[in-house]
């Protein structure tokens, strides 16, 4: 990470896409995409996804590391080009507990991530706990971040410290996109970014963390990008002009969250304007969902009814029977909710792919299509971009390859933004 930031600060149009997903096909897509490029790949886990108690994936930080390393080994991707990051590390999961208890767990969370070899750590103590006022005083946020930083510094060995980097900042959109309809989005004021840096510098120095300050590589801000279930707010460089100018005077860059679904030109403009770390998550699993839905349509054309996976019906049954991951986010009427379940840009389906029934139906879908030849006309009908790549000879038409390539469509847009020599 330090090398990428140094090159950016030296004037290169270089950034990095942060892949925020625990889906094995998404991780495989990212690693295969850069297998021969020489580029680093940044894969991040969030605190509610992966923590010392297992998170909603059931994985502790060391488990997630081994999970990613296992996929890297299968792909042949060298570990030294992998960067593991932890996102929203702090009291996020324990906001309903008193601050003292939540911070105690947060310290253990940080230690678990650092011990497991995660080198990019987002110190996020912005959320109010059960006995806190709302919102928290910025100095309280910074002092709590310093407590977390101290835990990381004391846990890391000398080799880990060479690679250890921190991201600070609190102004992040709702993880995974907005839950409600958006019309506009508030761009962080440069005075607020400056205050974030200043309060963290004071708090770190109070705690004797002067050396750790040199490891702070980025501040999280809102450059004016967002999405909800049906809309995307695209980057408007002029609205973030003052914010973009301010960071030039520091040794840091910005990290932008919820950059999913922006145009490739927007990614290039974001990196040019020093939002050099671009986080993406739902757009990747949305592409995965599109690929599986497309393959299901092909299956309906090629496989006899009694042999079909029924994957789309199984998804509906599971999500309607177990609505916990989508009910409070999607629209209330039946017809609207079904559209959201299938096609919402916030892609709440992503929480259901590990479900045993859905996983088995996807496996059957792929097995069924592996046993037949996929007609080019059918691929053109349901996956036209992949059809073009087949015609160019850069893709072979297996179900697995089609899924991987569909996910990589998203990564191609990020590469255009993050790599100076990509046309």
UniProtKB/Swiss-Prot annotation:
Keywords on record: Galactitol metabolism
SUPFAM superfamilies found in the cross-reference section: Aldolase
A Gene Ontology biological process term: phosphoenolpyruvate-dependent sugar phosphotransferase system
InterPro entries: Aldolase_TIM (IPR013785), GatZ/KbaZ-like (IPR012062), GatZ_KbaZ_carbometab (IPR050303), TagBP_ald_GatZ (IPR023436)
One of the record's GO cellular component terms: plasma membrane
Pathway annotation: Carbohydrate metabolism; D-tagatose 6-phosphate degradation; D-glyceraldehyde 3-phosphate and glycerone phosphate from D-tagatose 6-phosphate: step 2/2
Assembly, per entry: Forms a complex with GatY.
Similarity-based family: Belongs to the GatZ/KbaZ family. GatZ subfamily.
Functional summary from the UniProt entry: Component of the tagatose-1,6-bisphosphate aldolase GatYZ that is required for full activity and stability of the Y subunit. Could have a chaperone-like function for the proper and stable folding of GatY. When expressed alone, GatZ does not show any aldolase activity. Is involved in the catabolism of galactitol.
Name of the molecule in the record: D-tagatose-1,6-bisphosphate aldolase subunit GatZ
Taxonomic lineage of the native organism: Bacteria, Pseudomonadati, Pseudomonadota, Gammaproteobacteria, Enterobacterales
Gene that produces this protein: gatZ
């Amino acid at each position: 990470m330090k090398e990428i930031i140094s090159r950016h600060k030296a004037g290169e149009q270089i950034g990095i896409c942060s892949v925020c997903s625990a889906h094995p096909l998404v991780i495989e897509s990212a690693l295969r995409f850069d297998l021969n490029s020489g580029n680093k790949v940044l894969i991040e886990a969030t605190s509610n996804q992966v923590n010392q108690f297992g998170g909603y994936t059931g994985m502790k930080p060391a488990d997630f590391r081994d999970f990613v390393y296992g996929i890297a080994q299968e792909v042949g991707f060298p570990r030294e080009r992998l960067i593991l990051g932890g996102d929203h590390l702090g009291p996020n999961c324990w906001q309903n507990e008193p601050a003292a208890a939540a911070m105690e767990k947060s310290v253990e969370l940080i230690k678990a991530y650092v011990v497991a070899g995660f080198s990019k750590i987002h110190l996020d103590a912005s959320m109010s706990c059960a006995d806190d006022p709302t919102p928290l005083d910025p100095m309280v946020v910074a002092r709590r971040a310093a407590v977390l930083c101290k835990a990381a510094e004391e846990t890391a060995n000398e080799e880990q410290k060479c690679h250890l980097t921190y991201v600070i900042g609190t102004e992040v959109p709702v993880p995974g996109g907005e839950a409600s309809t958006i019309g506009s989005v508030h761009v962080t004021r440069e005075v607020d970014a400056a205050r974030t840096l200043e309060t963290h510098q004071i708090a770190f120095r109070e705690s004797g963390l002067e050396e750790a300050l040199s490891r702070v590589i980025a501040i999280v801000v809102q450059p004016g990008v967002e999405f909800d279930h049906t809309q995307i707010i695209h980057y408007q460089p002029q609205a973030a002009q003052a914010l973009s100018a301010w960071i030039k005077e520091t040794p840091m860059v910005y990290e932008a969250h919820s950059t999913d679904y922006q145009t490739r030109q927007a990614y290039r403009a974001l990196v040019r304007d020093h939002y050099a770390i671009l986080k993406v998550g739902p757009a990747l699993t949305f592409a995965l969902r599109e690929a599986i839905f497309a393959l299901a349509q092909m299956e309906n054309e090629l496989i006899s009814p009694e042999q079909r996976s029924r994957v789309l019906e199984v998804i509906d049954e599971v999500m309607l029977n177990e609505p916990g991951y989508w009910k409070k986010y999607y629209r209330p009427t039946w017809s609207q909710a079904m559209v959201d379940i299938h096609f919402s840009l916030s892609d709440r389906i992503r929480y259901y792919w590990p479900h045993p029934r859905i996983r088995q139906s996807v496996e059957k879908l792929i097995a069924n299509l592996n046993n037949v030849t996929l007609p080019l006309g059918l691929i053109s009908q349901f996956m036209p971009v992949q059809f073009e790549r087949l015609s160019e000879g850069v893709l072979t038409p297996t179900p697995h390859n089609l899924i991987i390539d569909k996910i990589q469509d998203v990564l191609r847009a990020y590469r255009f933004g993050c790599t100076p020599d990509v046309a």
